[in-house]
UniProtKB/Swiss-Prot annotation:
NCBIfam families: PRK13961.1, purC. GO terms for molecular function: ATP binding; phosphoribosylaminoimidazolesuccinocarboxamide synthase activity. One of its GO terms (cellular component) is cytoplasm. CDD domains: SAICAR_synt_Sc. SUPFAM superfamilies: SAICAR synthase-like. It catalyses: 5-amino-1-(5-phospho-D-ribosyl)imidazole-4-carboxylate + L-aspartate + ATP = (2S)-2-[5-amino-1-(5-phospho-beta-D-ribosyl)imidazole-4-carboxamido]succinate + ADP + phosphate + 2 H(+). This is Phosphoribosylaminoimidazole-succinocarboxamide synthase. Pfam families: SAICAR_synt. The gene is purC. The keyword Hydrolase does not apply. GO terms for biological process: 'de novo' IMP biosynthetic process. Pathway: Purine metabolism; IMP biosynthesis via de novo pathway; 5-amino-1-(5-phospho-D-ribosyl)imidazole-4-carboxamide from 5-amino-1-(5-phospho-D-ribosyl)imidazole-4-carboxylate: step 1/2. The keyword Nucleotide-binding applies. Keywords: ATP-binding, Ligase, Nucleotide-binding, Purine biosynthesis.
């Protein structure tokens, strides 16, 4: 018989995930259907979102050549029935206080930075780049993880060296870019561009660097269609940029610079977001989401 969720002690809540303690070495990481945008957790939820994030992470944890924090399969008997398919048993790590971002294309905050300074996170770039320009080689741009509700802070590589040492900083940079390139090459073969993504790493009890949290989910990555890709224009996305775009549109009536929280999402935006997440999972993994374990929406 599987344990109940209340058999485990709740440790922490994030924007999307809940963390529970299983034992001294293992945690239960549960992905909810919550969605965040512009540092707000929205009132609306996206049906099946937590299961899709978990399915995508499981696929890429097994695909990329990097040790990770998984400590059991997605049907591990330690996972309670009520969260099956949206929860993973993971090793407890000493998490590093930064996100490791790989950028293959100029977009988002990187584009704004470039337009203002000619650089992205302090890295000089050639003139004449525009929205969705592809970099000659992907950029590594670390960021300090902010507390819930605040913005992450981009930091220079030299600052990262001061924080973790030159050996660990080089290891984080090299592993981030290696993982990104491996996954981006696979995604291109399925008609998907991974424009950018972010990773988190932690250290285990033996001092090993492990990939942790989530990887290549539509929450942590920008996904574009190869067929629709055009330099100089905003791309069609298969990620939560779809939600961000609606929130800043006149249709939402929300003023980002104002004091009010974002409005609830209309039903058509909720369903379209779910379909985007499902589509990118199925195209990249080659599997049907209908076959993923756990109770669906």
């Amino acid at each position: 018989m599987r344990p109940a969720l209340f058999d485990y002690r709740h440790l922490a809540s994030g924007k999307v995930r809940e963390i529970y303690r299983i034992d001294d070495e293992h945690l239960l990481m549960v992905a909810s259907d919550r969605i965040s945008a512009f540092d707000y957790v929205l009132d609306s939820t996206i049906p099946d979102k937590g299961r899709i994030l978990t399915a995508m992470s499981v696929f890429f944890f097994s695909f990329v050549d990097a040790p990770n924090h998984l400590a059991g399969p997605p049907d591990d008997p330690r996972i309670p029935e009520e969260v099956l398919g949206r929860a993973l048993v993971v090793r407890q790590l000493d998490m590093l206080p930064m996100e490791c971002v790989a950028r293959g294309y100029l977009t988002g905050s990187g584009l704004l930075d470039y337009q203002a300074t000619g650089k992205v996170c302090g890295i000089p770039l050639p003139p004449g780049l525009v929205e969705a320009s592809r970099f000659a080689a992907p950029l590594f741009t670390p960021a300090m993880k902010a507390v819930l509700g605040e913005h992450d802070e981009n930091i220079s590589f030299s600052r990262m060296i001061e924080m973790v040492g030159v050996v660990r900083a080089n290891q984080l940079r090299d592993r981030t870019l290696q993982i990104y390139l491996q996954a981006a090459d696979h995604a291109l073969k399925t008609g998907i561009i991974i424009a950018d993504t972010k990773f988190e790493f932690g250290i285990d009890r033996d001092g090993n660097l492990l990939l942790a949290d989530e990887i290549f989910t539509p929450d942590s990555s920008r996904y574009w269609s190869v067929d629709d890709y055009r330099v100089g224009v905003v791309q069609r996305s298969f990620d939560k940029q779809f939600v961000r775009n609606w929130l800043v549109s006149p249709e939402s009536g929300w003023v980002r610079a104002g004091a009010l929280s974002p409005p609830s999402l209309p039903d058509d935006i909720i369903e379209a977001t779910r379909l985007c997440y499902v589509e990118v999972y199925e195209r990249i993994s080659g599997m049907s989401f209908d076959d993923w374990i756990g109770p669906g929406a």
